[in-house]
Design a protein with these regions (language model features):
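Metal-dependent phosphoesterase signature
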Residues: 70-90
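Short acidic, Gly/Ser-rich segments with clustered Asp/Glu that frequently serve as metal-coordination loops
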Residues: 23-31
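Residue-level marker for buried hydrophobic side chains located in beta-strands
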Residues: 19-21
Length: 197
């Protein structure tokens, strides 16, 4: 086992139970503000294993950009039939309440979620905190010379270098909030155990 695995200590401090959250959106932040959520995926981790995965499809108020459509494959026509964010918030909040929320690239997903909660006049439940798996993996990824941008190693990079099953490849290769939340949970648990090639 590499001595660089000591750089993964922060992952070993994660509780046995937590929630992984991921979103797919209408695009990137721009001069008009933050993008809208199109899908929100939650993976429930209990006793270091995946207990449940669920996806909420939410009707955006903004149009989905061509680039975003190419990433997640959801068209504006499809999204128009989704339920509103506020009509699903109580169910989403029920998963988040009193939990540690793990997000890969939390600096993207978390502000967007908070923006939606405020915009729709909802209330965020009390949570334990937010853990960004991308930022936490930076020291290890850099020491191991793995590709690592300024935000940290991508989920694709960690999936590949850790030998985690690529759930995206099982489908059409596109991103999806449910798939990516589950994939993040598998990557995080692999880093917790330091079990990889």
């Amino acid at each position: 086992m590499s001595m660089y695995n000591e750089l993964l200590w922060i992952f070993t401090q994660l509780p046995d139970d937590y929630i992984v959250l991921d979103t797919e959106t209408t695009g990137l932040p721009d001069e008009n503000g933050l993008p809208d959520i199109v899908t929100l995926g939650i993976t429930v981790v209990r006793n270091r294993g995946i207990a449940e995965t669920i996806e909420f499809k939410t009707q955006p108020q903004k149009r989905i950009s061509d680039e975003a459509q190419s990433i997640h494959g959801i068209t504006n026509e499809q999204a128009a039939a989704f339920e509103s964010f506020d009509s699903q918030w109580q169910r989403i909040a029920g998963y988040l309440k009193d939990q540690l929320i793990v997000i890969h690239n939390a600096s993207f997903d978390w502000p967007i979620l908070l923006d939606h909660v405020e915009r729709y006049g909802m209330e965020m439940p009390l949570i334990q905190g937010v853990f960004c798996s991308q930022k936490a993996a930076i020291p290890w990824a850099q020491a191991m010379n793995h590709p690592c941008g300024h935000r940290g190693p991508s989920l694709n990079t960690l999936t590949e270098v850790l030998g985690v099953e690529d759930l995206r490849a099982k489908g059409d290769g596109r991103h999806g909030a449910e798939i990516d939340s589950r994939l993040t949970a598998l990557v995080v648990e692999t880093l917790v155990r330091c079990e990889f090639r």
